[in-house]
UniProtKB/Swiss-Prot annotation:
Active site: 348, 468, 498
UniProt catalytic activity: Hydrolyzes Xaa-Pro-|- bonds to release unblocked, N-terminal dipeptides from substrates including Ala-Pro-|-p-nitroanilide and (sequentially) Tyr-Pro-|-Phe-Pro-|-Gly-Pro-|-Ile
Record PANTHER family: COCE_NOND FAMILY, PUTATIVE (AFU_ORTHOLOGUE AFUA_7G00600)-RELATED, PEPTIDASE S9 PROLYL OLIGOPEPTIDASE
GO molecular function, one term: serine-type peptidase activity
Subunit structure and binding partners: Homodimer.
A GO biological process held by the record: proteolysis
Protein name: Xaa-Pro dipeptidyl-peptidase
Free-text function comment from the UniProt entry: Removes N-terminal dipeptides sequentially from polypeptides having unsubstituted N-termini provided that the penultimate residue is proline.
Organism: Streptococcus pneumoniae serotype 2 (strain D39 / NCTC 7466)
Principal location listed in the UniProt entry: cytoplasm
Entry's family note: Belongs to the peptidase S15 family.
This enzyme's EC code(s): 3.4.14.11
Enzymatic class: hydrolase
Length: 757
């Protein structure tokens, strides 16, 4: 384990003493260090009647137990302090470590022995081997009462609200959209779990079209075969209009009553970060949105109608929209428990909705935590003039997603009444998708949140993985740079795939978010500020560094690609084409081994480099015909240890999100030997070689100069490493699978790779 502590806040000594005293650690500034440590430990072991016993089973050094040490005349030393501290954090002395000073350096332990009271205060705010901070572990065990009131420690809310006796209710928010054109505003179901409290509390809201269930069967039927010819497009300039949103006004009157009438029973799934915040005094709201089970309207996936309906839930929390008790719209209930302040959470589609919500500039949305979210839907299902698939999901497109998330069809009555209209709406969507050309058009323009990024007022926290080929890193990169300069923005850029990171051992992500939300939603005045970029170092396990920016580098490193012309044959023998189509993983493996139709260029790294931003290929290229698809991947090549893209379980169900509440696994990205690691990749239709909105002819056998930017990333390379650039046509995981007989030729002498460093 390595410690990477971003959540700790330096407080004045008087605050430290006051907070310790409130938790029963009655330490005196004038006492000697040894006496203070004993006083601290006897309170620490509050679950024991006889505190001599737990002291006797800890060690001060290799020859002395802690009780014997306190009974001796020996002085407290730095070595003894560290030895005791590591044991309190769950490490076994003489098993996990023998020399505390060596272990301190190996783990990056954040505490330097000096002022013992401040050392002990920081120790309580340090994560244990099992994933909780020490203070959270003690509170979970009953250190302070579960009194349904707020208690703070180091600028973070503690788990002092009951998660057993909570209010569970359902309301139906009246949106300002009418997606199915029935003349009534769509209703959106809101599932609420909130702690009991006499005052007003903030809300953690997860906007998830998946939450009420998914129609996997219908979605699978809607998948496309990726086999087909790359379209030869007519040259033209793509014209667009400013997206419009038509809102509807509330209709009719409704009796105001005191409480919701529908009780929330079981929910499909909760998000463990939300579980963590519930006993800390934050309401949990789950909203599936229009076109989902128990709500009304069509599934408009990603457009501002869908976003508006989610926004209206925040409006209700602030008294600007109504919520009914049921679908009759006869009785309404106010969110009189809400303080109006909201943070959004969730990954993938959930993080996408956070991005969209932020761009409305809605009052009350204080923080978004957008994890692996889409910023422009075109870049999810298309790329540079190509029809593409999200990584791992060949054949998926917008209409199959619509079938997946239109969960109203899971209710037989809704299916009978509404499926015909839903299918008619879906046909309109299919016509607008334009799978023929893969070009950007008005449909995608209406689902581009970057256009409204200037409206964002909330503080923004992103998480994204360098190995996320589902929602590719371009999404967070573009959103990060589109945000107004005056707002606070932060990015956790890890080396995983499309995964959550809130339960990783190596970083105090949950505690950092706690510090942020306690400040922004609960009004605690602290100096807490996350770095702009927190990056997981790819060269070592469990190592995180603070950076000033994602991209924006002034210096570049250029690699020449060769001295000759090389060709990429597009067509495969039928046997290989069929084999790759059945299992794209086989294609990826053989591509990395140099066995596919490809140009492979190994580039020695002659000095340490820190890539930060978008690698760019400048290529002199020609096609043997009037079309061309170019794929590129940049690998770090060579057998060595690399971080793996998916977290592994270190310890099952050891993280306590409250008090014996929603225990979850402690995880981390493994660091294992592999033959290579993907650094970045990209795909380009050569007819869109100069601009996404400009379609140009390709003249057979005529040279073209192409500037091709790959996916943004942050990656460290060391002198002696090897980069492998792979150029090819069809990618059997991502692109259309065109097996026509043509080839691309690259003049390597007139081509180069540029890395921003």
């Amino acid at each position: 384990m390595r410690f990477n502590q971003y959540s700790y806040i330096n407080f004045p000594k008087e605050n430290v003493l006051s907070e310790l005293k409130k938790c029963g650690f009655d330490l005196q500034n004038t006492a000697n260090h040894k006496d203070s440590l004993e006083t601290f430990l006897r309170r620490f072991f509050f679950t024991y009647q006889d505190t001599n016993y737990p002291l006797s089973i800890l060690a001060a050094d290799k020859k002395t137990d802690l009780l014997t040490f306190f009974q001796s005349e020996d002085e407290l030393t730095a070595d003894i302090f560290y030895t005791v501290a590591f044991q309190l954090l769950g490490f076994s002395y003489l098993v996990d470590f023998e020399d505390s000073d060596v272990f301190r350096k190996e783990t990056g332990f954040p505490i330097i022995y000096g002022d013992l009271i401040e050392n002990l205060y920081q120790l309580l705010n340090t994560r244990t081997k099992k994933g909780n901070t020490l203070i959270d572990q003690l509170v979970s065990d009953g250190l302070i009462p579960e009194d349904n009131d707020y208690h703070y420690f180091n600028g973070k809310s503690l788990a002092t609200f009951s998660n057993q006796d909570v209010i569970r209710e359902v309301v139906y928010v009246e949106s300002r959209v009418d997606t199915d054109q029935k003349g009534l505003s769509d209703l959106v179901k809101v599932s609420i779990i909130r702690p009991r409290f006499d005052g007003k509390i903030p809300a953690i809201m997860t906007a998830s079209p998946y939450h009420q269930g998914t129609n996997d069967k219908a979605s699978d039927k809607a998948l496309y075969k990726m086999e087909g010819e790359l379209e030869v497009k007519l040259p033209h300039k793509i014209e667009l209009e400013k997206p419009q949103l038509n809102l509807v006004q509330p209709q009719g009157k409704a009796e105001l009553i005191a409480e919701a009438e529908e009780k929330l029973t079981h929910i499909n799934s909760s998000y463990t970060l939300n579980d963590y915040f519930l006993p800390r005094g934050f309401a949990n709201l789950y909203v599936s949105g229009v076109g989902t089970k128990d709500s009304t309207g069509f599934m408009t996936n990603g457009d501002y109608q869908q976003i508006e309906a989610y926004k209206n839930v925040i409006d209700w929390l602030n008294g600007r929209c109504r919520a009914f008790t049921d679908h009759t719209r006869q009785r309404q209930v106010k969110a009189d428990w809400s303080n109006g302040k909201v943070a959004t959470t969730g990954l993938s589609y959930l993080g996408t909705m956070s991005n969209g919500l932020a761009t409305t500039g809605v009052d009350g949305l204080e923080v978004i935590i957008a994890e692996a979210g889409i910023s422009s839907w075109y870049n999810y299902y298309r790329e540079n003039g190509l029809v593409t698939s999200p990584g791992g999901y060949p054949g998926e497109d917008f209409d199959s997603l619509a079938e997946l998330t239109y969960s109203r069809n899971l209710l037989a009555g809704d299916y009978i009444r509404g499926n015909e209209a839903h299918q008619a709406d879906l046909e309109k969507v299919k016509a607008q998708l334009d799978r023929k050309t893969g070009d950007y058009n008005q449909f995608w323009h209406d689902r581009n949140y970057l256009l409204n990024a200037h409206k964002v007022k909330a503080e923004v926290v992103f998480t994204h993985g360098s190995q996320d080929w589902n929602v590719k890193p371009l999404h967070v990169y573009q959103m990060f740079h589109a945000l107004p300069t005056h707002i606070n923005k932060h990015l956790f850029f890890h080396n995983g795939a499309h995964v959550y990171m809130n339960n990783w051992q190596s970083i105090d992500f949950r505690e950092s978010i706690n510090a942020l939300l306690t400040k922004k939603l609960l009004g605690q005045e602290t100096d807490f500020q996350l770095p702009t970029v927190i990056w997981q170092d790819n060269t070592a396990p469990q190592t995180w560094l603070s950076l000033d920016n994602f991209g924006g580098q002034e210096n570049c490193e250029t690699f020449s690609l060769g001295q000759e012309e090389q060709a990429i044959q597009n067509q495969y023998p039928d046997k290989d084409f069929e084999r790759y189509g059945k299992t794209y993983q086989t294609f990826n493996t053989e591509l990395y081994q140099g066995k596919a139709n490809q140009i492979t260029i190994n580039l020695p790294v002659t000095k340490d480099l820190h890539l930060n931003g978008r690698a760019q290929l400048n290529l002199r290229i020609k096609s043997s015909t009037n079309k061309g698809l170019l794929s590129a991947q940049l690998l770090e090549f060579g057998q060595k240890k690399y971080l793996q893209p998916y977290p592994a379980i270190l310890s099952a169900r050891t993280i306590d999100n409250g008090r014996y509440h929603m225990l979850e696994n402690l995880c981390e990205l493994p660091f294992r030997p592999e033959a290579q690691r993907v650094v970045t990749k990209g795909y380009l239709n050569l007819q869109n070689r100069n601009d996404l909105l400009l379609v140009e002819d390709i003249t057979a056998d005529e040279w073209m100069d192409v500037q091709f930017e790959l996916q943004p990333t942050i990656y460290k390379l060391k002198e002696g490493d090897t980069l492998r650039l792979v150029l090819y046509t069809t990618d059997f995981e991502i692109t259309i699978r065109d097996n026509t007989d043509y080839h691309l030729t690259v003049d390597l002498a007139q081509s180069m790779l540029t890395l921003p460093c």
